[in-house]
Amino acid sequence: MQAPLQQLFDRGSLWLGNQPNHAADQASFVTTGQLELDQALGGGWQSQRLHEIQVPQFFVGELALVAPALMRATQQKRPIFWLSPPAVPYAPALAQLPLAESERQQAQHIVLTPSRPADALWAAETILHSGQAGVLLLWAEQPSAIAIRRLHLAAAESGAYVFILSPWQAEEARSYATRLRVHLSQDSVTGNGQVQWQLLKRTGGWPLRLARQALPKWPGK
């Protein structure tokens, strides 16, 4: 006999479309630095999952969303891998992260710039299978569904926070835990830049858009 629906909900075997799924271990989450986004994601970024951040152009505040994950990796003495970034990571900004001096000195940032997209995907998969990474950031223009599936499986074994940063992509089924699209606009009164988060996919909830807000700031500024 099937268990009553309520028992299935209580065990976390089922979820309601308008409610986040809290069955996951909260210790595996790290904040995005944005309260409403954390709530929509059930706690923030989850480790051992593949998260996509789609941007209309790079460096519009998206790195502020992953800064807390960089801090956690540093505190855990695990290296941070930057794969095919569009620019060299800005060392003075990384030095501003609110870490203890001993933690800051032991930070490991490894930048790899493969010449071909296929090599970058191979490097990402290899790094994740090694189990050494704390965070992996991969910039990819149009990764294939097969490549994403392979990275999804590798991320599940890695213990790392894994992010794919890309231009806007087609809204087709992909093996991501999170698909976040960044929309930019200006406040009609002040003229200041604003951002709106659109979650195309999230664990334990339907897609949604959050209210517009000011561009996120890098921690320590």
What kind of region is each of these model predictions?
Residues 1-82, 86, 93-106, 201-205, ...:
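Detector for small/aliphatic-rich hydrophobic stretches
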Residues 98-101, 128, 154, 174, ...:
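Short, hinge-like loop/turn segments at secondary-structure boundaries
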Residues 122-123, 147-150, 175-176, 209-211:
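A short secondary-structure junction signal
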Residues 166-221:
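Phosphate-binding/switch region of NTP-binding enzymes
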